[in-house]
Design a protein with these regions (language model features):
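Active-site mouth loops of central-metabolism enzymes
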Residues: 18-33, 107-121, 190-208
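Alpha-helix-loop-beta-strand connector modules within alpha/beta enzyme cores
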Residues: 65-93, 148-169
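Structural preference for beta-strand elements that scaffold enzyme active sites
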Residues: 4-8, 49-51, 90-92, 136-137, ...
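Conserved small/polar residues in nucleotide/adenosyl-binding loops
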Residues: 222-226
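Glycine-rich anion/phosphate-binding loops
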Residues: 24-41, 65-78
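Conserved, mostly hydrophobic/aromatic
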Residues: 9, 35, 94, 130, ...
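Active-site beta-loop-alpha junctions enriched in small/polar residues
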Residues: 12, 55-57, 96-102, 141-143, ...
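Conserved anion-binding
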Residues: 100-103, 147, 153-200
Length: 226
């Protein structure tokens, strides 16, 4: 059972302590040093898979989330350090711009809406940077159309063929994400709805459609002689 567990960890470069997350009871925002200690504790418990979520200082956020594209940003350097210390750890990193944008949205806003194609260009750069840093699994949570195919292509072209994509295929526009947004310090701007790119909870068929599209864009099948 332990081998199947994934521990989410929230981390910030702007703190030096372990702070409880009021909106997520039992979870904490870690400094880098204390995060490393937490990972060692988890390994001793037999938990080897970690999902990392950065809480980005407001000073590093902008309209386009450009810090997410910096190959030397905090999360990329942290991924490399973790993999150097604990190569047995399986690291999952999130691919979306919401921790990095002042709007708190998952993509780049043009004319008051998230520009899907412009955002895809940013996401593929972000994904490659995280893979190059040592991420074992890339987890796109942005819900842009066509992102899995674009990211898969970018990973292949950059030589990161073994990097796994774990897609957030079905992500609904819901207030239930509030606690998570608090944890990563993402504040949604007024007047812009994530319903532009996340799914309507009333549409019960769209989740299956989105999952099928992700499979078409990023699923790799090996042939068998059997």
């Amino acid at each position: 059972l332990k081998s199947k567990l994934i521990q989410p960890l929230f981390v910030s470069e702007s703190i030096s302590s372990k702070q409880p997350l009021e909106s997520l009871p039992g979870q904490f925002l870690f400094s880098k040093d204390l995060l490393i200690e937490e990972i060692e504790l988890l390994l001793n418990l037999g938990i080897k898979t970690i999902a990392l979520f950065p809480n980005i200082p407001e000073s590093l956020k902008d309209a386009d989330g450009t810090n997410a594209l910096d190959e030397k940003n905090f999360i990329c350097k942290l991924v490399s350090e973790i993999k150097d210390r604990y190569p047995e750890v399986v690291l999952i990193t999130d691919v979306a711009l919401d921790p990095y944008t002042v709007s708190g949205h998952d993509g780049i806003i043009k004319n008051d809406v998230v520009d899907n194609d412009l955002t895809l260009e940013a996401l593929k750069k972000m994904a490659v940077n995280l893979a190059e840093a040592g991420s074992d699994i890339i987890a796109p949570s942005d819900m842009m159309d066509g992102r899995i195919g674009v990211i898969r292509g970018a990973l292949e072209q950059s030589g990161n063929k073994d990097t796994i994509i774990l897609s957030y295929s079905a992500k609904y526009s819901s207030n239930f994400y509030g606690p998570f947004r608090d944890a990563i310090g993402s504040k949604k701007a007024e007047g812009i709805s994530k319903a532009n790119y996340q799914m309507d909870k009333r549409n019960i068929e769209e989740a299956l459609k989105e999952a099928e599209l992700d499979l078409q864009e990023g699923c790799l099948l090996y042939t068998s002689d059997a």
